[in-house]
Amino acid sequence: MPRDFKKVLCGTDFTEHSYSALAYALRFAKLADGALIVAHFVHVPTDDIYAHEEWPRTFEEASARAREMLAELHTTRLENYPKTELVVDIGAPAEKLIELATARQVDVIATASHGRSELVDLIMGSNAEKLIRHAPCPVFVVRRGVG
């Protein structure tokens, strides 16, 4: 079945746990000699108290830093895999991954079971849970400590 995954999507929050999912995503892409899309999303606070003129600059800085970190990942963890596309965008990770998976018609999404904030996961539900419920393709979930 992984040989059928010609287009693999993996989101990262730059934690070791997300790197485990990234390792599986790379394996799937290599098995199929397919494309690997690695994405990071800068989260936008939705509360009005955050409506501040500094946010656009902060998001630009965060996006620039994320692009640098993805480029470093491409070299260090993705072995410069030539069929890799690096994506940085602004928005809620689960929703943006679903949008990206739909737009790019990916065959599988690889994700870590929990993100950076376990408290938010507990209250709002994890990104993995949202992906499982709404993704347009299979979702491969890597639990903490596996990889």
Region locations from a protein language model:
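Structural beta-alpha unit
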Residues: M1-R3, T75-I109, V146-G147
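Small/aliphatic-rich secondary-structure junction motif
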Residues: P2-E53
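General small-molecule cofactor/ligand-binding pocket signal
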Residues: I37-A39, E85-D89, F140
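Short secondary-structure boundary segments
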Residues: H40, A112-H114, R143-R144
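Short, hinge-like loop/turn segments at secondary-structure boundaries
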Residues: E53-R57, A103-R104, N127-A128
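A short acidic, glycine-rich active-site loop
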Residues: W55-E68
